Amino acid sequence: LRSRNDPGRRTLLKGFAGLGVMLASGYGVRERVLLPELLSDYRTATGERRQLTLAQGVDLTLDTHTALDTRTTAAGTELFLSLGRVLVSAGDIRLSTANGQVLPAPRSRLVISHNLPWQAGTQVQVLSGSASIKLARGDSFSLDAGQQVTFDSQTDSTPRPVTVGADAWVNGLLIAERMPLGQVIAQLNLYRRGVVRCDPQVAALRVSGSFSIDRPDASLDLLTRVLPIRVQRVFGYWANVVAA
């Protein structure tokens, strides 16, 4: 029998402790999105995208890990996005988040996202048409086609051009144009059954290209062929992206 001070035993225990930290951390990631997913009127699971047509003539595409509710107010029907990302082809509808309200013009197409791992606050991207935005604090402004803005309940950013491939996720793609690797990994992580971690040492590497979100592990392998990185996989569930 080995003694309690045996180096091999200590190494094994450290390994289990490290795995425990990873499991706890991973649980925290899923816990953050679990409650709104379970309680919302419309929700999507890991890797799922869902298309909806509402009675108001509104077509919606919900991205993975999205939670959306329908509310009836004195002003009419309102959608409330508590988590995730949605493509809106607008009829007569209003969409709100905790940070404000978005009112698309008729026949407009918008991507609206809220509380994403790589994005603080709410982001509105107008692909066509226009939209009016009213912040929770009361300020209002408008966006035209080709503009996007990110805001929280108190502040808003200056409108800038819509990101390349803003709606590519609808077709199962992530389009990156000099995107930080950390953000690419964060996006792929949402579509993968498991957890992907990106080492801060390589998180700032810039990535350009087209990647499948329906096959996130294949996309991780593709990244190793174009960047000086490697992927460490643990039990097929955990993946760590580190320097090669």
Label the predicted regions.
Residues 3-4, 137, 175, 210:
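Short N-terminal micro-motifs specific to bacterial/archaeal maturation
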Residues 10, 60, 186:
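Short alpha-helical basic/polar micro-motif
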Residues 11-14, 33, 81, 132-144, ...:
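Short charge-dense sequence patches
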Residues 12-21, 82-86, 153-154, 161-166, ...:
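Short low-complexity stretches enriched in small and charged residues
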Residues 37-39, 193:
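Short secondary-structure junction motifs
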Residues 155-244:
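N-terminal export/assembly leaders
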